[in-house]
Amino acid sequence: MTTTALTTASPSQVRQNYHQDSEAAINRQINLELYASYVYLSMSCYFDRDDVALKNFAKYFLHQSHEEREHAEKLMKLQNQRGGRIFLQDIKKPDRDDWESGLNAMECALHLEKSVNQSLLELHKLATDKNDPHLCDFIETHYLNEQVKSIKELGDHVTNLRKMGAPEAGMAEYLFDKHTLGHSES
């Protein structure tokens, strides 16, 4: 086998009704999901620091990081099942290393989830425009409802932290960490 044969992707024999634009959009979504995982991992590490010490914030964001990575892996599996090719891109560094407060991190997470949701809605529209019912069903089944739930949960967390006086009232984040995140399913 020549070097050229090893480096060029052969055409898929399973590909059917899978537009190149959809394939490219899936690769972009994979990158976005991995970026979200990376951001949540950064948040988790911040809250696990000895000078921050909010262990349930750390656990919550670590769980979110794992979920986002699983989303990326699911999309990779879909890409292979549909006969597409996975082209991984560099994952952008999170915008910050210091998340300042639980409230700030939750607000950033809410913004991130809304961005991911918007990207999924655009992917769904593309699949609709390309008459790809398989991709539409996949996005509806595995992503859209979960995104709405995540956005609602994060919105509730932001509201409750604000009501408690965070971040000015330091005790608010400690109590939220202990009583809300300490008893959540995440």
Swiss-Prot record:
Pfam families: Ferritin (PF00210)
Main localization of the protein described in the UniProt heading: cytoplasm
MF GO annotations: ferric iron binding; ferrous iron binding; ferroxidase activity
Keyword terms of this UniProt record: Cytoplasm, Cytoplasmic vesicle, Iron, Iron storage, Lysosome, Metal-binding, Oxidoreductase, Phosphoprotein
Positions with a binding annotation for Fe cation 1: 33, 68, 71
Enzyme Commission no: 1.16.3.1
Residues where Phosphoserine is found: 184
InterPro entries assigned to the protein according to its UniProt record, in alphabetical order: Ferritin, Ferritin-like, Ferritin-like_diiron, Ferritin-like_SF, Ferritin_CS, Ferritin_DPS_dom
Highest taxon of source: Eukaryota
Keyword Repressor appears in the UniProt entry: no
Subcellular compartments: Cytoplasm; Lysosome; Cytoplasmic vesicle, Autophagosome
GO terms, biological process: immune response; intracellular iron ion homeostasis; iron ion transport; negative regulation of cell population proliferation; negative regulation of ferroptosis
Recorded catalytic activity of this chain's protein: 4 Fe(2+) + O2 + 4 H(+) = 4 Fe(3+) + 2 H2O
Binding-site list for Fe cation 2: 68, 113, 147
Domain Ferritin-like diiron: 16-165
Single GO cellular component term: lysosome
Assembly and oligomerization: Oligomer of 24 subunits. There are two types of subunits: L (light) chain and H (heavy) chain. The major chain can be light or heavy, depending on the species and tissue type. The functional molecule forms a roughly spherical shell with a diameter of 12 nm and contains a central cavity into which the insoluble mineral iron core is deposited. Interacts with NCOA4; NCOA4 promotes targeting of the iron-binding ferritin complex to autolysosomes following starvation or iron depletion.
Role, per record: Stores iron in a soluble, non-toxic, readily available form. Important for iron homeostasis. Has ferroxidase activity. Iron is taken up in the ferrous form and deposited as ferric hydroxides after oxidation. Also plays a role in delivery of iron to cells. Mediates iron uptake in capsule cells of the developing kidney. Delivery to lysosomes is mediated by the cargo receptor NCOA4 for autophagic degradation and release of iron.
Family statement: Belongs to the ferritin family.
UniProt-recorded name of the protein: Ferritin heavy chain
Origin species: Cricetulus griseus (Chinese hamster)
Higher taxonomy: Eukaryota, Metazoa, Chordata, Craniata, Vertebrata
Gene assigned in the entry: FTH1
